[in-house]
Amino acid sequence: MRKSTRLLTHSLFGPVFKILFHNKTVCGGCNRKMPSLVNTEIEAAVKGFLIDQEKMTEVVERMTKEIKMGLAKDTHARAVIKCFVSHVQDLPTGKERGKYLALDLGGSNFRVLLVNLISNSDVETMSKGYNFPQTLMSGSGKALFDFLAECLSEFCHSHGLENESLALGFTFSFPLQQQGLSKGILVAWTKGFSCEGVVGKNVVSLLQEAIDRRGDLKINTVAILNDTVGTLMSCAFYHPNCRIGLIVGTGSNACYVEKTVNAECFEGYQTSPKPSMIINCEWGAFGDNGVLEFVRTSYDKAVDKVTPNPGKQTFEKCISGMYMGELVRLVITDMIAKGFMFHGIISEKIQERWSFKTAYISDVESDAPGEYRNCNKVLSELGILGCQEPDKEALRYICEAVSSRSAKLCACGLVTIINKMNINEVAIGIDGSVYRFHPKYHDMLQYHMKKLLKPGVKFELVVSEDGSGRGAALVAATAVQAKSKL
């Protein structure tokens, strides 16, 4: 028997406004009408995902402390948000010109690009994506970089570039300790990678050595960067006030423009003639020291246990696309096991780890209130048939709980950075599949940022076009131009 149900009086996305003459409930921040009835046990199960304003403020305070520790030389070693120096001090001016290569290794995506900067309004890009063999993700580092060089060679030969001397920007979307613009030490693998012989090594050297071993290309890797830095750079090419880059996709991270004098881990932080430095926060590790336990659930801990890096990347596991779908799946299977969904009948597919794709969350939440076309398709793919409306509403409610927490925590992170920069107006370049494809993520993020920021602070959320590709080329371009001025 289904337990008694009751009308929800709170919203996953913000405060509730009741329009009495329609007798409907509307979510603040997204104008999404709430489901009228949800099983109380299901509501209780997802309660831990519902972060209120007080908890969000606490997240901002704790993250502020961690970022300050990451920036300071004396506390950097024990900080969980490392705030690595990117060594990128020059933002695009819009006057960069020429052809540049970019190589983008970002977990689920691997691409080679040729970017031709013709003018600030005319940028030509040619790119090719390559399938990444699963075996390479846990094989040897040499095999990994030989594969990257092979794909780079194939791309260059197919575009008649094999005889051109080209600078390359390498977007490497894993935790890096940069010791120079073209020297980045891998701190740890994430996103399911575990290649041997790479952690603690300069990945630029590993790539350049693989290119040189082939002997068929005239390519010089001049810069390595994180995808967040590329996102910021690409956005700044068109939006001069862009000072923050954010990725919310397979993983999550942010970077921002800090005053050089505050970047104490930069050797020349007190003497550099350049006033600014892009800081790669690596905020995915926020909470690895336990400071986020008050916003984690038993489902988060269950997901963490089956990842290749248990106890690590705590913040990322709460908000990124790699884990959101699995969180939803665990809630569903728990509710089925307790008899609160689908009459206690479970399919083989839903029992498989990672079978509930994060894309399903976007699909389910794309349905209009009272409609279940996408929901039915998702359930069919999971082998769950003949569902009644309360089960479909419950699924949507669970998806909303997980996605709204992700947006709230991202909002906390961005507000922390804006407060740290102490600026009143900023553009934020954003990329990643969660932000791009979730139907309400932008609105949720914007809504909760406004609630947390002090009055008068203006911000703009901008989709950064091909940050990991064009952004890498722009870093290479600024590096080449800066070197030519020496």
Curated annotation (Swiss-Prot):
CDD domains found in the cross-reference section: ASKHA_NBD_HK_meta
UniProt function note: Catalyzes the phosphorylation of various hexoses to hexose 6-phosphate.
Record-linked PANTHER family: HEXOKINASE (PTHR19443), HEXOKINASE TYPE 1-RELATED (PTHR19443:SF16)
GO cellular component: cytosol; mitochondrion
Family, as annotated: Belongs to the hexokinase family.
Residue segments, region Glucose-binding: 167-193
Entry-linked InterPro entries: ATPase_NBD, Hexokinase, Hexokinase_BS, Hexokinase_C, Hexokinase_N
Any one Gene Ontology BP term: glycolytic process
Pathway: Carbohydrate metabolism; hexose metabolism; Carbohydrate degradation; glycolysis; D-glyceraldehyde 3-phosphate and glycerone phosphate from D-glucose: step 1/4
SUPFAM superfamilies: Actin-like ATPase domain
Gene Ontology MF, one: fructokinase activity
Residues at which ATP binds: 128
Swiss-Prot/TrEMBL catalytic activity: a D-hexose + ATP = a D-hexose 6-phosphate + ADP + H(+); D-mannose + ATP = D-mannose 6-phosphate + ADP + H(+); D-fructose + ATP = D-fructose 6-phosphate + ADP + H(+); D-glucose + ATP = D-glucose 6-phosphate + ADP + H(+)
Region (Hexokinase large subdomain): 226-466
Protein's recorded name: Hexokinase type 2
Chain spans, region Hexokinase small subdomain: 93-225
Annotated gene: Hex-t2
Keyword annotations from UniProtKB, A to Z: ATP-binding, Glycolysis, Kinase, Nucleotide-binding, Transferase
EC number: 2.7.1.1
Domain spans labelled Hexokinase: 36-477
Coiled-coil segments on the chain, per record: none
